[in-house]
Swiss-Prot record:
<keyword id="KW-0244">Early protein</keyword>
<protein>
    <recommendedName>
        <fullName>Protein MGF 100-2L</fullName>
    </recommendedName>
</protein>
<comment type="similarity">
    <text>Belongs to the asfivirus MGF 100 family.</text>
</comment>
<comment type="function">
    <text>Plays a role in virus cell tropism, and may be required for efficient virus replication in macrophages.</text>
</comment>
């Protein structure tokens, strides 16, 4: 066995792990679990939205406009990705069929809607249960 392989095996051994100070172990474990937790949260949100039939096929702007014309009045989300910059809320009035578009702002890792900060779209949706009645339109540019 070469010198590099033996050093690698030595680093991976239980004894080497025991020799690492606890502070570094905690940082490593915390980072590992935090990253897994974030991925889990993203998958959970995506699964939840798909179960609610919020996703639609890829459409261009004209396709979205046509779909909104035939859609009933209500609130709709238009996004290319739940966590990306392009995120709009569309409110269609049932009486006259007009629509108001509001671009939602991302501030760091938060979404800012009406002056309030949300860590992710899931929190906003949880606090606004009436929006669940209407579809979320996934729009891929």
């Amino acid at each position: 066995m070469g010198n590099k392989e033996s050093k690698y095996l030595e680093m991976c051994s239980d004894e080497a792990w025991l020799n690492i100070p606890n502070v570094f172990k905690c940082i490593f474990i915390r980072k590992l679990f935090y990253n897994k937790w974030l991925k889990y949260q993203e998958k959970k949100l995506e699964k939840r939205l798909r179960l609610l039939s919020f996703y639609h096929a890829k459409k261009d702007f004209i396709g979205i406009r046509d779909m909104l014309q035939t859609a009933p009045g209500g609130s709709y989300f238009i996004t290319d990705n739940i966590t990306e910059e392009f995120l709009m809320l569309v409110l269609k009035h049932p009486e006259d069929g007009s629509a108001e578009f509001t671009k939602l702002c991302l501030k760091g890792s938060c979404i800012m809607i009406d002056g309030y900060y949300y860590d992710n779209l899931d929190i906003f949706l949880a606090e606004s249960p009436d929006l669940y009645k209407y579809p979320l339109i996934r729009y891929d540019r």
